[in-house]
């Protein structure tokens, strides 16, 4: 929990690289679309809410990871369509947070 900023950025940076590989090598990941992921995203959101209500730190961490995967997955699909990528998502969020 005392990770440095560099360690945090490195950990986050691994995720898009792993997903890139999965989109090539894994048939399930390769066939996913925004629509096919949508119900899974809703399910993962409910699982996070349940973990939060139970104050279950182990499952909060797990479910946050699952949702983070979905965010990166949607951004990857957007990138493949030439619409946006994870940088655009992060920039949009940061621009919204800065007032």
Task: Enumerate the language-model features and the residues they cover.
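Flexible "arm" and connector segments at domain edges
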Residues: 1-64, 69-99
């Amino acid at each position: 929990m005392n990770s440095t900023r560099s360690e945090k950025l490195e950990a986050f940076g691994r995720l898009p690289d792993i997903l890139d590989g999965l989109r090539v090598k894994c048939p399930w990941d390769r066939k996913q679309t925004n629509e096919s992921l949508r119900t899974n995203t809703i399910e993962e959101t409910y699982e996070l809410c349940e973990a939060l209500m139970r104050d279950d730190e182990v499952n909060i961490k797990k479910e946050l990871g699952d949702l983070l995967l979905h965010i990166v997955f949607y951004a990857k699909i957007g990138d493949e369509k030439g619409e946006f990528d994870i940088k655009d998502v992060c920039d949009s969020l940061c621009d919204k947070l800065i007032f």
